[in-house]
Amino acid sequence: KTHEKGSDEGHFMAAVVCLRRTKQRINTDEFDVMEVVDGQQRLTTLIILLNAIKLKFGEKDKGEAKLLRELGELLVKEGDELLLLQTNHDATHYFSDFLRKGTSQPSKKAKTLADREILEAVEDCKAFVTRWMSDGKTLPDLLSLLKNRLFFLLHEIDSEKAVYTVFEVLNNRGLDVSWLDRLKSILMGAAFELKNINHAGTITELHNIWRDVYSVIGLRQGLSTEALRFAATLRAVEAPSRPLGEEASVDALRSVATTVKSIRDTASRLLRVTEACDAVTANVRINSVTRISQARLLATAISLRGDIDETQRKPLLARWEKVSFRIYGMLLNDARTRVGDYVRLAWQVLNEKLPVKSIDAAIREIGSEFTIERAVDALRNANCYEGWETELRYFMFRYEEHLAKQQKLNFSNEQWEKIWMVSPSESIEHVWAKSRAPVKQRHRLGNLVLLPPKLNSKLQDDDPKDKAEAYRKTGLLIAGEVADFIKAGNGWNKTAIESREEAMLDWAAREWAD
């Protein structure tokens, strides 16, 4: 748009806030080294765009060759050693490799949010330069526009102590800055405000802790929110009745971070909670159980108890899994159900150091109203497909484990790894095809099975007798069992569906009972 307005028009990009560090001499020139406090994204994008332009210049044309050298000297200094801009979160060297070598990876390969932002910016800038040229405009025109008609306002600060205060003020402008980032700036600022401490050592340690926090979070932005809320909820003075919100969590953690020890402990505790949350949510096997926030909170609290060894923790989490699946999976209660009980118990697990037996008894008590008899009845002759896909996948996985144990076979996870990687609908198979089955039998538990991804769409409307061999070839015991049912009876009908359903419900009544 600035280009179309004519050569007399400019565009104000942003105010950039920088911390002045030291001077650095390059040959006979002296430069100031500046740390960007605010405006990093715009500057990074601008530099990536300049490099994308540089990569399009050729050396045969004298004019382009001159511009190529100028851009190269601007972006990379001192014999390829010093970059014009260096980023804090470039452990994978995506940014530096693009500036030095002109190479880049697809953004889908990114493992962290910071890496994804860099790689997407590279893709966007390269695509923009290509479009600019395809529209008949020249690269020198684009470079001239960037050099002469885009403007920044530079605000310099000369004290690192002021960095975090400035950052917090800037974050109150209504910009979309995560509450976790705000907490970081608050804690770092509080550390600088303290008197008579080793600021350099403390700040370095805090930087390392926060680096680890962001590394664990990776691409899962929701994990930063959950870790923050859980850390504050579990740190509350009294047992809360529900998880704290993000803003309340920042306020709560800020209030206790008043000394160097408490600041360090707050950051370290947040890291441990982040790691525990990651372990709970990363287990795709139980994602039908962990879809409820307070259930995840309790599992996180149990995982954080360092004095409970694995031989004790495993049965506790098994109890938690049984009760939670009965309440939220089999009986389909929503997140309002027993929220206070879960949250208070999670707080007590950590703050009152409840014994293992007491934790187990408390989990049993939470589930006492939600009996296995009610849960099984809820699945009998019910629609176990629409709205229950995730729970069905978990149910079938657990049933597969049971069949392997029953037949004294080693459980094979190979096919299940593929099943977990796709949405449940890509693996759920109606033995009696949806288009042919009577309405009352169509979505019943006994008519459903899981197959390797996409196989269900290949089989589609085939007669169950014609599907049996394909089921057996999958290697899945649950599919093989269906093939056995078909072979043993007169095909697949209401009687077969009811018989298989009752067999699975008999097993479920034992598996998820207290």
Segments and roles (model prediction):
Residues 1-32, 356-482, 486, 496-500, ...:
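Betabetaalpha-Me/HNH-type nuclease active-site subdomain
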Residues 1-235, 469-470, 474-475, 482, ...:
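Glycine- and hydrophobic-rich flexible loops that cap the catalytic core of alpha/beta enzyme folds
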Residues 31-43, 152-157, 169, 173, ...:
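Short, charged/polar micro-motifs that form catalytic or ligand-binding hotspots
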Residues 34-42, 142-147, 155-162, 287-295, ...:
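Secondary-structure capping and boundary motifs in well-ordered enzyme cores
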Residues 151, 179-402:
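A cross-family structural signal marking well-folded subdomains
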